Every structure is written in structure tokens, then in C-alpha cells.
């Protein structure tokens, strides 16, 4: 598994390329803007683009989708869906709160968290479709996942789930909230 990233657009959104180099396939995650740069990253990987995956529908994560879709097909996915990317399995976890339809994508020991989870913070819930209670449930769902994960957020620097469990007040509150609601775990 290889992860490449570039920051795109005026809000500096992280766009990721998840690759299985052995199989020669890749998935593009949150192509927020600057389609030529994004497509160049795909071309430089030498891998065949198999998926374009969006963590949510806000413009800063989707602006480059239209020009990229002119070259690649689209597919919709839902909570619990698994996508095969070479030898990798990507699992979709619905994580509403920042927006309706927000998801996190889990591949091996990696979580692509979009605007659900940031280093020491979480995504805003004051936009249309945002809901603080849903955000706490989503953060609790992530925090209660068994194991250790590297977290690649939609903005700012990567982190680890272990670190966020210890220091992120939103994850800590979400884990209590999620557990109290009787929905602990994935």
C-alpha cells in the first residue's frame, strides 16, 4: 500500500492517491480542485485509476471530480460496502455530522477521515446538513474501532487514532456518547 497526497484548492484540501503498486491500481480520494495536478499525480503513479472516492460532497473535496469523470466511471457506495483495490480492501464507514452522507474510508491500518476527524479536532457542524450529535456518534464509532490506525484527514496533517483517543476532546466525548448509546465498535 502506498499513499501519495497533494494539497489542492483555496482551502488547501488534502487529495490522496491510495495505490497497490504490485497490482498496478489506485484510488483517488477527495479530488478537491486543480484537476490537471490531480491527474498528473495519477499518471506519475503508473497505476490504473480504479476508483474516485469522496468522503463527502462539499465543494472543497469535489471540484475536480467533473473533469476527472470525463475519463473515468462513477460509482456510489454506502456504509459497510467494501471495495477491492488490488490486494487492498477499502471499507466504507458512514460518519455523518460534518455533512449528511459523510464517510470515512478504511484500508488496512489507515483511515481517510475527510472532514470528520482532524488532528486534535473535528469537522465543523454549523453548515447545512451538519449535526453535532451525529458528529459525536461518528467520532465515537471511529474511536471505538479496535486496533491502531494512521489517520489521513481532509485538511491539515496526518495523525493516529491512538493519539486522538488520548488527546482529542471530541473523540473522547464521542466515545462516551457512542458507548452510552449502545453502539460501541464498528
Q: Residues of each region from the PLM?
A:
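Active-site HxH/HxHxD metal-binding segment of metal-dependent hydrolases
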Residues: 12, 23-26, 33-91, 166-174
Amino acid at each position: 500500500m502506498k499513499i501519495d497526497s497533494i494539497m489542492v484548492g483555496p482551502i488547501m484540501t488534502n487529495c490522496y492517491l491510495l495505490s497497490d503498486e504490485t497490482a498496478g491500481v489506485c484510488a483517488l480520494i477527495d479530488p478537491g480542485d486543480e484537476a490537471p495536478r490531480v491527474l498528473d499525480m495519477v499518471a506519475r503513479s503508473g497505476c490504473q485509476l480504479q476508483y474516485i472516492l469522496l468522503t463527502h460532497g462539499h465543494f472543497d473535496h469535489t471540484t475536480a471530480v467533473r473533469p476527472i469523470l470525463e475519463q473515468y466511471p462513477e460509482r456510489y457506495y454506502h456504509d459497510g460496502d467494501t471495495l477491492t483495490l488490488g490486494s487492498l480492501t477499502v471499507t466504507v464507514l458512514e460518519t455523518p455530522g460534518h455533512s449528511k452522507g459523510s464517510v470515512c474510508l478504511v484500508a488496512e491500518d489507515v483511515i481517510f477521515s475527510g472532514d470528520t476527524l482532524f488532528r486534535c479536532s473535528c469537522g465543523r457542524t454549523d453548515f447545512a446538513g451538519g449535526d453535532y450529535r451525529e458528529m459525536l456518534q461518528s467520532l465515537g464509532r471511529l474511536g471505538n474501532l479496535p486496533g491502531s490506525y494512521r489517520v489521513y484527514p481532509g485538511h491539515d496533517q496526518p495523525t493516529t487514532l491512538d493519539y486522538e483517543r488520548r488527546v482529542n476532546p471530541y473523540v473522547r466525548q464521542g466515545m462516551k456518547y457512542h458507548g452510552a448509546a449502545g453502539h460501541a465498535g464498528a
